[in-house]
């Protein structure tokens, strides 16, 4: 996965405290090591995390290591990006999307 100090790791254990209780817009990229489209999306997620640092919290969650949260939010395919604001899922993108789509979706919720 593409590395960025602005991409945080979400787990079933920290999801509630870190993502749902975030005072900022939080986006979470559900992915898996074996997922080709997830690997293609990773650099885009890292770029967006860097561009919106301080305004948006960006997380990645490995669905194989953390099955509870994806099930709770009905994530059926990966990659899936969910957008959370004030503790609620407000938007989602399924599949590999261009950077412009992620940026416009983020801007819609800021």
Identify what each model region corresponds to.
Residues 60:
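Conserved residues in the N-terminal Rossmann fold of short-chain dehydrogenase/reductase
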Residues 1-27, 32-57, 65-80, 85-110:
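Proteins that catalyze or organize thiol-disulfide redox chemistry
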């Amino acid at each position: 996965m593409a590395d960025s100090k602005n991409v945080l790791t979400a787990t079933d254990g920290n999801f509630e405290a870190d993502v749902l209780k975030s005072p900022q817009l939080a986006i979470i990229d559900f992915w898996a090591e074996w997922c080709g489209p997830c690997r293609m999306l990773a650099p885009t997620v890292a770029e967006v995390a860097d561009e919106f640092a301080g305004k948006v919290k960006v997380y990645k969650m490995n669905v194989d290591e953390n099955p509870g949260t994806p099930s709770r939010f009905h994530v059926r395919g990966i990659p899936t990006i969910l957008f959370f604001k004030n503790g609620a899922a407000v938007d989602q993108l399924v599949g590999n999307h261009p950077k412009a789509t992620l940026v416009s979706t983020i801007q819609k919720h800021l």
